[in-house]
């Protein structure tokens, strides 16, 4: 595979992780350098990781084929637009942009320029999600909890754009239906925007997703559960594992399955815990993006996916605007 010349915009906490992952993926990428607006931090990272620090975002964009944007969300649009207009492929952290209008403009530019854009909805690459493999997922009810302890980093956006958007993306990816209605509420505890929020997303096909996100928790939790006809799937993104419980019409597994009577007749309960893949989710999403560029295939998480998740997130924020307690 051809090594792609890549540069990273932003060298904060997550940007530094991206730099390390790209260094590890040296068969896919040639890490040309990075830019960070904090010159003192840039000098420190350059020395620590032995990477060239560029003097401007523009000079870095000119020097590479691929740009990885890991800056605060408010800068996503201007940087991505500059890179796309120069014909560069772009990996951009979630959320895609600060506003829906910005996302729509980037979407149009991407199609116009014919470049690849992938959005960093990293849970698609979490070992827990990957372990489901080819299992058919057709959920009719989804319950998600994404709880984090308070950290000032990330409070530039609401908890919906910071945390809940991960689960919004997963739900939109798996539920093959349009959103019908949204009910939501939230509480601003410390930040200017909600620090805890709950959203009930109703789909045209009858599926309901009940999502809770908080950055005011005493303990971490990143779990989502899918309920569908004859199956229940539980994913723990923090522990990186999954549990699958299925109701089978016949004991075809040949094992000692529990038998039970249901409203639809006799069933057998099959409980499976797939072996999770030993992968680094961030490194895998970047390597997968490289593959889509080299082989001219559709990115795993498209700009359209990022736009849909952002649009629903902002709909939730609008609903909460009428109900927020602060």
List the model feature ranges, each with a label.
Residues 59, 66-69, 288-326:
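C-terminal helix-rich "cap/oligomerization" subdomain common to oxidoreductases
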Residues 122, 230-300, 326:
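C-terminal glycine/acidic-rich active-site capping loop/insertion
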Residues 168-243, 276-295:
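Contiguous beta-strand/loop segments that form the cofactor/metal-binding neighborhood of enzyme cores
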Residues 18, 49-107:
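Beta-loop-alpha module in the N-terminal Rossmann-like domain of NAD(P)-dependent dehydrogenases
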Residues 120-127, 150-179, 194-195, 306:
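Mid-domain beta-loop-alpha active-site segment that forms a flexible
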Residues 97-154:
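A contiguous active-site-proximal alpha/beta segment in oxidoreductase catalytic domains
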């Amino acid at each position: 595979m051809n090594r792609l010349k890549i540069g990273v915009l932003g060298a904060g906490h997550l940007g530094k992780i991206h730099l390390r992952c790209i260094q590890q993926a040296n068969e896919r990428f040639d890490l040309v350098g990075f830019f960070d607006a904090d010159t003192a931090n840039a000098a420190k990272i350059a020395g620590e990781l032995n990477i060239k620090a560029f003097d401007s975002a523009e000079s870095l964009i000119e020097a590479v084929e691929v740009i990885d944007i890991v800056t605060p969300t408010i800068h996503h649009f201007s940087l991505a637009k500059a890179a796309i207009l120069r014909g560069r492929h772009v990996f951009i952290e979630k959320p895609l942009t600060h506003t829906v209008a910005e996302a729509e403009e980037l979407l149009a530019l991407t199609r116009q320029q014919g470049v690849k854009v992938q959005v960093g909805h990293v849970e698609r690459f979490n070992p827990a999600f990957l372990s489901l493999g080819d299992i058919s997922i057709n959920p009719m009810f989804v319950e998600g909890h994404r709880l984090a302890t308070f950290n000032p980093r990330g409070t530039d956006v609401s908890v919906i754009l910071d945390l809940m958007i991960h689960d919004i993306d997963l739900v939109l990816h798996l539920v093959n239906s349009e959103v019908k209605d949204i009910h939501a509420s939230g509480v601003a505890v410390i930040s200017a925007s909600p620090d805890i929020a709950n959203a009930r997303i109703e789909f045209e096909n009858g599926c309901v997703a009940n999502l809770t996100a908080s950055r005011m928790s005493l303990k971490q939790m990143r779990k989502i559960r899918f309920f569908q006809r004859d199956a229940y799937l539980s994913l723990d993104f923090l522990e990186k594992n999954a549990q699958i419980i299925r109701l089978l019409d016949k004991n075809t597994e040949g094992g000692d399955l529990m038998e039970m009577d249901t409203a639809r007749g006799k069933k057998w309960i099959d409980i499976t815990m797939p072996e999770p893949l030993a992968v680094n989710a961030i490194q895998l999403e970047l390597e997968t993006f490289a593959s889509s560029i080299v082989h001219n295939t559709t990115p795993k998480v498209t700009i359209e996916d990022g736009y849909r998740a952002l649009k629903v997130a902002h709909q939730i924020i609008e609903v909460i605007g009428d109900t927020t307690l602060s």
